[in-house]
Curated annotation (Swiss-Prot):
Role played: NDH-1 shuttles electrons from NADH, via FMN and iron-sulfur (Fe-S) centers, to quinones in the respiratory chain. The immediate electron acceptor for the enzyme in this species is believed to be ubiquinone. Couples the redox reaction to proton translocation (for every two electrons transferred, four hydrogen ions are translocated across the cytoplasmic membrane), and thus conserves the redox energy in a proton gradient.
Protein's UniProt keywords contain Membrane: yes
Name this protein carries in UniProt: NADH-quinone oxidoreductase subunit D
Family that this chain belongs to: Belongs to the complex I 49 kDa subunit family.
Sample GO molecular function, one term: NAD binding
UniProt enzyme class: translocase
Signal peptide coordinates: none
Highest taxon of the lineage: Bacteria
Amino acid sequence: MMDGDIRVNTYDDGSTDFQTGEQKIRNFNLNFGPQHPAAHGVLRLVLELDGEICERCDPHIGLLHRGTEKLMESRTYLQNLPYFDRLDYVGTMNQEHAWCLAIERMTGTDVPRRAQLIRVLYCEIGRILNHLLNVTTQALDVGALTPPLWGFEEREKLMIFYERASGARLHAAYFRPGGVHQDLPPELIEDIDTWAHEFPQMLDDIDGLLSENRIFKQRNVDIGVVTEEDIQNWGFSGVMVRGSGFAWDLRRAQPYECYDEFEFQIPVGKNGDCYDRYLCRMAEMRESTKIIHQACEKLRNEPGEIMSRGKMSPPSRGDMKTSMEALIHHFKLYTEGFHVPEGEIYACVEAPKGEFGVFLVADGTNKPYRAKLRAPGFAHLQAMDYLCKGHQLADVSAVLGSLDIVFGEVDR
């Protein structure tokens, strides 16, 4: 009993409510998703609301779980590569990159310079693909209809660059342990460079629509603030870290491939809110465009091999027609696959959403003993309850949009 006529009732599930005379006050539970258009895939949030205020946010995951890590244990290293396109299916080649890096470090393979440049070029195209989708759909989540239409127009052009390099628009499977599948024709490099000259104009258009838009700022400023302590507690990475003022980027902090040769800035925010994360992504697209220019220039001037020659790469067609050993090598490579020496390694890349890592345990056979995938979106989604507490129901979709979550990598 409480003082006066206010009594507390306790229920079997441990929840309580207050009874004031005849009236009961109990928090309202609401399902957000998995069919909700702002849920970015198959996310289900169980929200506990006190009026309009979100008291608790419980993410339910697993609706896109396919057991990728277990499936990888029964496939050869090369057969596992396409699984990585299906994790974060918005900016695909960055995930392939992490897998190839892990295998190359385990086997001590040196990637030819031209292949490194092609990888950097296509990883940055993937970064722009990702940020274009995120920035424009974040705008859609808070009520702006035009940016997604403009963003998808540019994404279509980038998808065609993917298709011209690999034959596929989305699931490219273009990287290989030891290099890339095939060389880029000179016309493609020219077309990418031309596109990169025109793209900043489109960014200026989106900038003009959103950055100083009163409604967009009201919906995003001071929403979902992330502090230095939160970053360490929740394991944030990528834009979630840089939006709070910390210039942590694996391309600079732990350079891989030939990123240390490129000139680019690391955009950082100041307040760590949804709006600063949006500004970081906009600035990152401009920096990626600079890297694309530099990569195209280097590719024009540096012809060469695109695969390291050895047991991990297929022989040329010409060799296979004249050499029995080359034919046997080709057959064994695509049936049994190459063997990776025993050991374990962690390889990570600065994917568009944050640090995407692969912890690979090899037992000396042609299949991985265990591969653990470290998806950035998984760590970010964990913090939904923490970030949404005390905000209004309408702010939940703004926070979700700024986390940049794709369910392929969260559920795996």
